Amino acid sequence: MNNVLIVQRKHINTFPKHPHISQAFAHLHICTFAHFPSIRTFPKHSHIFYLMQLYGLLGYPLGHSFSARYFADKFEREHIDAEYRNFEFDNIEEAMQHLMALPNLIGFNVTIPYKQAVMPYLTSLSPEAEAIGAVNVVCAQHTDHGKLVLHGCNSDVIGFSDSIRPLLRPEVHKRALVLGTGGASKAVMHGLKQMGIEPTYVSRTATLGRLTYEQLTPEVMSDYKVIVNCSPVGMYPKVDACPAIPYELLTPDHLLYDLVYNPLETLFMKRGAAQGAVVKNGLEMLHLQADAAWQMWHTN
């Protein structure tokens, strides 16, 4: 019986301030820990239980992610009784059905490819997330009536801005090329504008207001001294790939920032460094946005 939790019906309302927990177990009499890995019990009082705080990362695929290890280390280091899971789903609707059924969910991070796809499922957005048009942090709140309220935020812009700011030289870095047009690029564009840098998208297809890789002439490369890779090109396991920019036109005045952090030095960075450019990966951004996400989960 060591791996069985007995819930006596007369004790179901042990948590009047947390009706969502009581409701989640109202139909139970006996359940196994295998079904509820986040349950904690008191050995001498089988009717008393609580659910650990649950956090996680939504995305697909998640093989490249450091987030689960980052938060596991944080919980152990700071003695936080919580769990961080990878929610790896190839379908956003199925993913949200799963997440919204978790009674102990406090919040979750969002990564590729769901930073925009998750937005229709949210109850509200922070002003910054709304302005950016992408969400990478979701805060979950359970109402007294058992309803789950999901609030979308964006900590990518904080992580990116705080990470790149020390490397910027205002007299040189006035314009930026942003490679890729996904959810992360929206936060980068927003952050660059906030720092007074004029950003321009670069994509493989011609679109109004954007440059193509073929349009990166010597004049353009001389004018745009900051280049941010927001695409997954060069990410493990495809480490021999890099964005198709004219690396021979780079100079020591150029700053190349790669949101990819696995590998720690991408081919994009190596080729930039070979030309004397300043280079940086996205690992510090990951740490800073994760710290900001933690604050959002506990203040929203």
Pin down the residues of each PLM region.
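Glycine-rich adenosine-cofactor-binding loop
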Residues: G59, N154-V157, I164, H173-K193
